[in-house]
Amino acid sequence: MDPEPSLEIASQVDFTLAFGFIGIVILLFCSAIVSGAEVALFSLSQKDVEDSIQENNSKGKIISELLEKPKKLLATLLVANNFINIGVVILFSFIGKNIFEAIDSPVLKFTIEVILVTFLLLLFGEVLPKVYASRNNIKFAQLVVYPIAVLDKILSPISIPMREVTVFLQNKLGKQKTNFSIDQLSQ
């Protein structure tokens, strides 16, 4: 006897929703790692890096190597985070069709999806990891250094040209103004 078609469709929907939710959780975790890494790595002082090298030679050296090219590292982190966040939005849109199917108005459905996905991305992909990383920068940097180093290698074909364009634009648009010294202000 064949299974009833309505049960088969329901199990496919449940299966799709489950994988969609799992995918969103994984991508939000990846976004948290990348966002936290940005804060943790760029808030390290030179002494923190040196202490990290002394404490854990391999992780400390990788942290130091990554920070030798800060613009490339920043480009890598921003590109990775954008790819991840786009993935979250696409997956959420995909499962949102099933979750919000009872809502007839496409405008209302779209508005709810945008508000929910924005909330999830901001809270779990940006704010919480950055707060944690700023309070535990050395620990967080050492925790994420290997995945970030892999990302840095994988995304080099994108981040290096981005860095070059950024430097070119900075040179064309003018140098950053320096701060005035106390002597200059007193004159």
Give the residues covered by each predicted segment.
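Membrane-embedded alpha-helical segments of inner-membrane proteins
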Residues: 1-187
